[in-house]
A protein has these predicted regions:
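Short beta-strand elements in bilobed, periplasmic/extracellular small-molecule ligand-binding domains
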Residues: 71-85
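Proline-aspartate-enriched helix->loop->beta-strand connector
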Residues: 98, 102-108, 112
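Structural motif
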Residues: 84-96
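Short, flexible loop segments at boundaries between secondary-structure elements
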Residues: 81-87, 128-164
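An alpha-beta-alpha
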Residues: 43-71, 176-189
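A transmembrane-helix-recognition feature enriched in membrane-embedded lipid enzymes
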Residues: 14-22, 148-194
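Electropositive, gly/pro-rich neighborhoods at or near active sites that engage anionic ligands
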Residues: 1-50, 56, 60
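Short glycine-rich anion-binding loops that position phosphate/pyrophosphate groups of nucleotides
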Residues: 14, 110-115, 138
Length: 194
């Protein structure tokens, strides 16, 4: 699904460092935090835009709606996503809501590798013009539902550390699992396309 995206950012500082160390490839990290900061600045100026927020649970949905309202937005729609089967993703209820609302932006705030699959599913099924943004939990840095990341922490690739301190039970396991990226980078043939 990532290969079929219109645009993908290097938002993992760990991945960027691995490319530098093992492949001598220099890329700049462009985090979800930084992207959403710029996007939210855009929305503050363009308050007439409509947002459809796909959220992981009711609590985050309330926080996300409250934050988007604080930007001055009036047309905000929220949807609490069910637990998706990434091999057979199908959500007719979501499709029907989106076809009815026709938002300018669909903000997919679910993680766990499902956001990109849902984004592709929507891209292939929707016929109206919209922008689908798969940002995972990045909005939680603004709503304060997750670790309180700021520009300094983001710039120096310390977001992972702050998340680990803020919620060790979730992120320790996630980061241990993420170590599999090391051999993937080492043994993959990576081409740079200009």
């Amino acid at each position: 699904s990532i290969k079929k995206a219109d645009l993908v950012f290097f938002d993992s500082g760990f991945f960027v460092l691995l490319l530098k160390i093992f492949k001598n490839i220099n890329v700049k990290k462009f985090s979800g935090y930084k992207f959403l900061g710029l996007f939210f600045d855009y929305l503050k100026i363009n308050k007439n835009k409509s947002i459809f927020s796909v959220d992981p649970n009711f609590e985050y949905s309330k926080s996300n709606k409250s934050y988007l309202r604080s930007l001055g937005l009036k047309k905000i729609h929220n949807y609490v996503a069910p637990k998706y089967n990434s091999l057979e993703l199908n959500d007719k209820k979501l499709l029907n809501l989106l076809k009815k609302v026709k938002p300018n932006f669909i903000l997919i705030n679910i993680g766990g590798g499902t956001q990109e699959i849902l984004g592709l599913y929507l891209k292939e099924k929707l016929v109206f013009k919209t922008t689908i943004l798969c940002t995972g939990a990045a909005i939680s840095f603004f709503t304060k539902d997750q670790a309180p990341i700021n520009n300094f922490i983001d710039k120096f690739y310390l977001g992972w550390f702050l998340r680990l301190i803020f919620n060790p039970l979730i992120f320790f396991k996630r980061y241990i699992f993420g170590l599999k990226l090391i051999p993937m980078v080492i043994f993959s043939k990576i081409k740079i396309l200009n």
